[in-house]
UniProtKB/Swiss-Prot annotation:
ATP binds at T29, L30, G31, P32, D86, G87, T88, T89, T90, G413, N476, A477, A478, D492. The keyword Transmembrane helix does not apply. The keyword Nucleotide-binding applies. GO terms for cellular component: cytoplasm. This is Chaperonin GroEL. Keywords: ATP-binding, Chaperone, Cytoplasm, Isomerase, Nucleotide-binding. Coiled coil: none annotated. One of its GO terms (biological process) is protein refolding. The gene is groEL.
Length: 543
């Protein structure tokens, strides 16, 4: 395929146009008075959202060079979302600010490599300063406060803090759609392990790329499943019940995997295969945990069992199983309460005798998975559009809350970024490195400027007053008042803020050091088919 190539200033200018189109769309959502963005969907009603990463992923530009700039910023939002689960709009605003300030200096003749070095040094200093002013989050009330700020709903904050109290900070919390209009919290027994489906063709929901199995059977084995004939009699028995099947095995390969996938695609029966969690002796123990939780038996040579001899009585059962590309969640296993209690007691006794910190950590993980359960927040709303928007907000809030528990909190509303300016400004750098530092200093102001602008205030005035205010005091854009941010509950998780800054600085630096951009040349439109010989155009009925 032929390529289009742009160089130097032309290349950077084209990419920056794409950066601006995406960032200008996303940044209107920032802050307590941020607006919504309406996204057209190929099917169904439009999606109304203020979630930065959701908006960024939807944007495709016609110009290939501009689209590359937009996609790089979208990558910043996605990466921040993957690491911290929130802060995607802040990351986008920071990226745009660093790119714009950097481009001015590069155009004026500054060395992009020196600027990049200065940006990296200043960013590292800002991150350390953020960690130094972080306050730990503990207690139900503090957790509820973090969740309420992220979701813009005190009720959601209460649900998330209640869920984390019930299943632990590292417990499994899922978000589902409610059948009614009310949002409610439900805690059910369950287990999660870090293994996803072996083929994406096994998913049942193509939009979310997850496989949901209702009332499934579970085959648990530490063997490889390579020959489909080994499990064919068992598959035929499961097929008669018209219920789905989850296969947990050392691996599923050879002819077995394509055969299972083909039957899934044809709709013969619903089957999902995942690899067994853990390794070595720990894998055997975890498979036994799953078997006890689900009322099944591990098909293993240790018990003298072969796959070809497995019967329906060896299969575990559960009310529901959800599998995505990275993890499997088993909800309401059919194992007996007595067997589960005995297993928990055994693990606790092993905890008392182990001398290895690593073994202790893994035993505690197994204990939490067996006894902790799964919290389900069932989201209700009057319309489908409102339901989707609410789900996105709760997902962001849950991620932000976990990030806050992990690394602590700082004053929100961009205040913490203004606070660390003093530390960054104190860096003694020279030449283009100093220019890079100054670019970061200007970018650190941008989230506050945008929050103020979205709320109808002049950003520069707010920033000047903020720089001269006592530590911890900030601007509440929702009310227009100057308050103690943390006491008022306007807070941001450190992990969210630092991830946004680190990812923004990384990608913005790459854009500034770009000297050539290569894009695919658009394919020429195919010529219209020739009219048959001897045919009179007037015979076409005037169309």
């Amino acid at each position: 395929m032929a390529k289009d190539i742009k160089f130097s200033a032309d290349a950077r200018a084209a990419m920056v146009r794409g950066v601006d189109m995406l960032a200008d769309t996303v940044k209107v959502t920032l802050g307590p008075k941020g607006r919504n963005v309406v996204l057209e969907k190929a099917f169904g009603s439009p999606l109304i959202t203020n979630d930065g990463v959701t908006i960024a992923k939807e944007i495709e530009l016609e110009d290939h060079f501009e689209n590359m700039g937009a996609k790089l910023v979208s990558e910043v939002a996605s990466k921040t979302n993957d690491i911290a689960g929130d802060g995607t709009t802040t990351a986008t605003v920071l990226t745009q600010a660093i790119v714009h300030e950097g481009l001015k200096n590069v155009t004026a003749g500054a060395n992009p490599i020196g600027i990049r070095r200065g940006i990296e040094t200043a960013t590292a200093t800002a991150v350390e300063a953020l960690k130094a002013i972080a306050q730990p989050v503990s207690g139900k009330e503090a957790i509820a406060q973090v969740a309420a700020v992220s979701s813009r709903s005190e009720k959601v904050g209460e649900y998330i803090s209640e869920a984390m109290e019930r299943v632990g900070n590292d417990g499994v919390i899922t978000i589902e759609e409610s059948r009614g209009m009310e949002t409610e919290l439900e805690v059910v027994e369950g287990m999660q392990f870090d293994r996803g489906y072996l083929s994406q063709y096994m998913v049942t929901d193509n939009e979310k790329m997850v496989a949901d199995l209702e009332n499934p059977f579970i085959l648990i084995t530490d063997k490889k499943v390579s020959n489909i004939q080994d499990i064919l009699p068992l598959l035929e028995e499961v097929l008669k019940t018209n219920r789905p099947l989850l296969i947990i095995a050392d691996d599923v390969d050879g002819e077995a995997l394509p055969t299972l996938v083909l039957n899934k695609i044809r709709g013969t029966f619903n089957v999902v295969a995942v690899k067994a969690p853990g390794f070595g002796d720990r894998r055997k123990a975890m498979l036994e945990d799953i078997a006890i939780l689900t009322g099944g038996t591990v098909i293993t040579e240790d018990l003298g069992l072969e796959l070809k001899d497995a019967t329906m009585t060896a299969l575990g059962q559960a009310a529901k199983i959800t599998v995505d590309k990275d993890s499997t969640v088993i909800v309401e296993g059919s194992g007996s309460s007595e067997a589960i209690a005995n297993r928990i007691a055994l693990i606790k006794s092993q905890l008392e005798t182990t001398t290895s910190d690593f073994d202790r950590e893994k035993l505690q993980e197994r204990l939490a998975k067996l006894g902790g359960g799964v919290a389900v927040i069932k989201v209700g709303a009057p319309t489908e559009t409102a339901l989707k928007e609410m789900k996105l907000r709760i997902e962001d809030a849950l991620n932000a809350t976990r990030a806050a528990v992990e690394e602590g909190i700082v004053a929100g509303g961009g205040t913490a970024l203004i606070t660390v300016i003093e530390k960054v400004a104190a860096l003694e750098l020279e030449g283009d490195d100093a220019t890079g530092r100054n670019i970061v200093l200007r970018a650190l102001e941008e989230p506050v400027r945008q929050i103020a602008l979205n709320a109808g205030y002049e950003g520069s005035v707010v920033i000047d007053k903020l720089k001269n205010s006592p530590a911890g005091t900030g601007f509440n854009a929702a009310t227009g008042e100057w308050v103690d941010m943390i006491k008022t509950g306007i807070i941001d998780p450190v992990k969210v803020t630092r991830s946004a800054l680190q990812n923004a600085a990384s990608v913005a630096s790459l854009i500034l050091t770009t000297e050539a951009v290569v894009a695919n040349k658009p394919e020429p439109a195919a010529p219209a088919p020739a009219m048959p010989a001897g045919m009179d155009p007037g015979m076409m009925g005037g169309f």
